[in-house]
């Protein structure tokens, strides 16, 4: 990803910060900060604002390493339990101690080797991260009940040296992302506590003698319980656990990445009724996976036998799936309700005739299905065009916009299905996605293209393009989502970009966790954690979850229960 390459080159100047392994944590962090200040001063003097280096409060190789393992290592069974290749791990350690900056992606570092190196780093600290003078206090908290343990953990963590506290917070946050994927990597909170405990807490300074090791082993079971508790209860132990990525009024934080798909994710939808809500994903091999929307647990998965799935959408508690062989309807229990033969690639619910109707696009036609009668109610012929994307224009316009090949957009009356007009954009290739966004005005249509451009169009007055949005790293636009006073674009370059809907400026970019095209996304409210979350599905066979906070995003009303 180009953003990662730029970041690697910027951080490259931070290489020579002195010895890392065996050095006090504070020394490493302070040397790093000094180097950062020097680099930023040089950039300012040359007016090179693009080379500003973000200040990192933990050793940089760990900061980057956490992201690298989240990108490439979450699905490795036994990550942190299995040993790395001894010579490769030693080579990495020597490079870092010589002050070399390691680009993990360019060097194709094995995540297992990096995981092993991380444990070595903490094991070689002059004093353990949890501080040996606090050993007895940590051990004694195990005599308390669960609530008392959490309260005591908060106190003890707060009393740690600032550099230790920050390092512990980021390490435990990272280990939590590993544990979320324990069904795939077999590294539960308990297993992580077992392998990490001896590296984080020991008694009497550095564990180098036989006596030290014997004492360490004697307390290993208790230390495992402490680290397990830290991982399980991290949201109650640490403040500001999830770092904010964006700036301004809207706050976005990375929460989790969930791996385990065998093929590329093709679609993601919310399936809900008055009692429950789940997130469905579909991959290119036809596998449907269902997650609990509140705790992210994988509830079930199955082979739909649909062939290659292209996209999916939902109406309440039913999923509609477009595949190489059909459009199919599934209930929340995962049962096939009905299947309509025929290849389709785009699906959108449109409210008309007192119900939601599914508009499905394919080669030279649109098929419209009733979600009430489960029948085809209309077929619209569009000779010479392939229908790639569809969106409804909310309000009084009564329009549906359709993105096609050759940069064409076709506008239909959503009640009659009659064509209203055609628009030609500057795009030479497909209009890959469309969304209607309304904030403090009548609204505008955002149209993403295969030409790496986004066109913002007035759908009410003269149908003119009011703005063309671009970015040097932007590739094919896969989906656009309207959130608050912004529009989010997901593209083939693996980044999610957030655009201000009035100024069209880039508010932020979510870069570090997907490694391939982001194909689809949904915004949902987590009732358990009481926050809005943005779920993204990617060709890297994973989904990522981000928390979204904005004063314009209010808590939704409670669902109406069936009585």
From Swiss-Prot:
GO terms for biological process: small GTPase-mediated signal transduction. PROSITE patterns: RHOGAP, WD_REPEATS_1, WD_REPEATS_REGION. One of its GO terms (cellular component) is cytoplasm. InterPro entries: Rho_GTPase_activation_prot, RhoGAP_dom, WD40/YVTN_repeat-like_dom_sf, WD40_repeat_dom_sf, WD40_rpt. Gene3D superfamilies: Rho GTPase activation protein (1.10.555.10), YVTN repeat-like/Quinoprotein amine dehydrogenase (2.130.10.10). WD repeats lie at residues 260-301, 303-340, 383-422, 470-509, 514-556. SUPFAM superfamilies: GTPase activation domain, GAP, WD40 repeat-like. One of its GO terms (molecular function) is GTPase activator activity. It comes from the Eukaryota. The record marks 81 as: Arginine finger. Residues 51-238 form the Rho-GAP domain. The keyword Chaperone does not apply. CDD domains: RhoGAP. Keywords: Cytoplasm, GTPase activation, Repeat, WD repeat. It is found in: Cytoplasm. Rho GTPase-activating protein involved in the signal transduction pathway. This is Rho GTPase-activating protein gacX. It comes from Dictyostelium discoideum. The gene is gacX.
């Amino acid at each position: 990803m180009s953003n990662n390459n730029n970041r690697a080159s910027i951080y490259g100047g931070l290489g020579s910060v002195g010895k890392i392994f065996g050095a006090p944590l504070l020394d490493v962090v302070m040397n790093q900060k000094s180097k950062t200040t020097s680099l930023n001063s040089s950039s300012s003097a040359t007016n090179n604002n693009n080379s500003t280096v973000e200040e990192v409060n933990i050793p940089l190789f760990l900061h980057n390493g956490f992201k690298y393992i989240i990108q490439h290592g979450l699905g490795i069974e036994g990550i942190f339990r299995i040993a790395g290749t001894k010579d490769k791990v030693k080579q990495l350690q020597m490079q870092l101690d010589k002050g070399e900056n390691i680009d993990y992606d360019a060097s194709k570092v094995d995540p297992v080797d990096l995981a092993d190196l991380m444990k070595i780093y903490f094991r070689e600290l002059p004093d353990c991260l949890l501080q040996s003078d606090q050993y007895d206090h940590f051990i004694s908290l195990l005599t308390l009940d669960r609530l008392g343990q959490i309260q005591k953990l908060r106190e003890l963590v707060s009393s740690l040296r600032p550099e230790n506290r920050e390092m512990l917070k980021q390490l435990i946050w990272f280990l939590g992302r590993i544990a979320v994927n324990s069904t795939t990597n077999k590294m539960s909170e308990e297993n992580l506590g077992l392998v990490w405990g001896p590296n984080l807490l020991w008694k009497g300074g550095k564990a180098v003698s036989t006596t030290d090791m014997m004492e360490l082993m004697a307390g290993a079971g208790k230390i495992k319980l402490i680290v397990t508790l830290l991982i399980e209860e991290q949201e109650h132990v640490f403040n500001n656990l999830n770092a904010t990525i964006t700036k301004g009024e809207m706050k976005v934080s990375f929460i989790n990445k969930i791996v385990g798909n065998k093929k590329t994710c093709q679609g993601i939808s919310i399936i809900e009724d008055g009692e429950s809500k789940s997130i469905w994903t579909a991959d290119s091999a036809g596998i449907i996976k269902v997650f609990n929307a509140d705790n992210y647990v994988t509830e079930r998965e199955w082979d739909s036998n649909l062939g290659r799935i292209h996209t999916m959408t939902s109406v309440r508690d039913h999923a509609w799936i477009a595949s190489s062989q059909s459009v199919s309807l599934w209930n929340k229990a995962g049962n096939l309700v009905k299947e309509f033969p025929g290849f389709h690639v785009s699906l959108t619910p449109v409210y008309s005739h007192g119900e939601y109707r599914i508009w499905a696009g394919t080669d030279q036609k649109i098929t419209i299905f009733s979600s009430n009668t489960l029948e085809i109610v209309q077929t619209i012929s569009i000779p010479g065009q392939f229908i790639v994307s569809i969106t409804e224009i909310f309000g009084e316009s009564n329009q549906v916009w359709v993105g096609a090949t050759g940069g064409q957009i076709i506008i239909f009356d959503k009640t009659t299905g009659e064509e209203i007009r055609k628009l030609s954009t500057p795009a030479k290739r497909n209009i890959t996605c469309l969304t209607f966004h309304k904030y403090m005005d009548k609204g505008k249509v955002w149209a993403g293209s295969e030409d790496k451009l986004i066109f913002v169009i007035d759908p009410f007055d003269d149908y003119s393009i009011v703005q063309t949005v671009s970015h040097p790293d932007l590739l094919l636009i896969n989906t656009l989502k309207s959130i608050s006073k912004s529009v989010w674009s997901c593209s083939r370059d693996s980044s999610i970009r957030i655009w201000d809907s009035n100024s069209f400026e880039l508010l932020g970019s979510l870069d570090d966790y997907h490694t391939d095209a982001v194909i689809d996304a949904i915004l949902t409210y987590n009732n358990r954690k009481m926050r809005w979350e943005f779920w993204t599905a990617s060709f890297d066979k994973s989904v990522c979850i981000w928390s979204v906070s904005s004063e314009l995003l209010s808590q939704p009303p409670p669902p109406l229960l069936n009585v």
